[in-house]
């Protein structure tokens, strides 16, 4: 009888341990830090602005104008300050392709060099090294606009809709894919 209890106890321990060992290390589900209207899909980019900015929605054409410095003031007459991720970041590549209509970072750099030389643009976008830096910049600069992966948004900034769609909505176009 003692032997049966010992085998049963050992078997139970093996089952319990193997269940936790076989579970992936990243099995904990990551929950967005800021509640959005929809559940963002992995790879959705969120356009973020300073919390005081009253803008709720921008069209893709308006976003393009802001990111290319063709518009440099919000409707409140607040000066805009565009933030971009560093060259080579997948988020930056997606913004260049989907918002700016450019396939290479070099096209973006050339665009701003020409615009600055012809005095059409005074302020170039601010390049930031990480999503944390992007959020911090946008949270601290009242006219700032930037972007991060939707699952990285925190309550210090506000997500705006693009073409009346939020990250996670069906048909949302700003994705890394």
Where are these regions (language model features)?
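Sec/Tat signal peptide C-region and signal peptidase I cleavage site
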Residues: 22-27
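Bacterial N-terminal signal peptides that target proteins for export
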Residues: 2-11
């Amino acid at each position: 009888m003692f032997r049966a209890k010992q085998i049963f106890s050992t078997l139970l321990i093996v089952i319990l341990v193997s269940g936790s060992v076989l579970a992936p290390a990243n099995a904990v589900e990551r929950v967005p830090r800021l509640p959005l209207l929809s559940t963002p899909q992995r790879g959705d980019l969120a356009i973020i602005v300073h919390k005081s900015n009253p803008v709720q929605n921008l069209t893709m054409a308006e976003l393009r104008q802001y990111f290319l410095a063709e518009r440099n003031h919000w409707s409140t007459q607040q000066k805009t300050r565009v933030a971009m991720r560093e060259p080579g970041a997948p988020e930056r590549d997606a913004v260049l392709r989907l918002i700016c209509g450019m396939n290479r970072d070099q096209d973006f750099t050339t665009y701003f060099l020409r615009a600055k030389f012809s005095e059409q643009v005074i302020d170039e976008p601010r390049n930031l090294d990480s999503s944390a830096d992007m959020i911090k910049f946008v949270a601290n600069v009242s006219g700032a606009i930037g972007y991060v992966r939707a699952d990285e948004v925190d309550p210090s900034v506000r997500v705006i809709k693009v073409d009346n769609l939020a990250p996670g909505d069906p048909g949302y176009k700003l994705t890394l894919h």
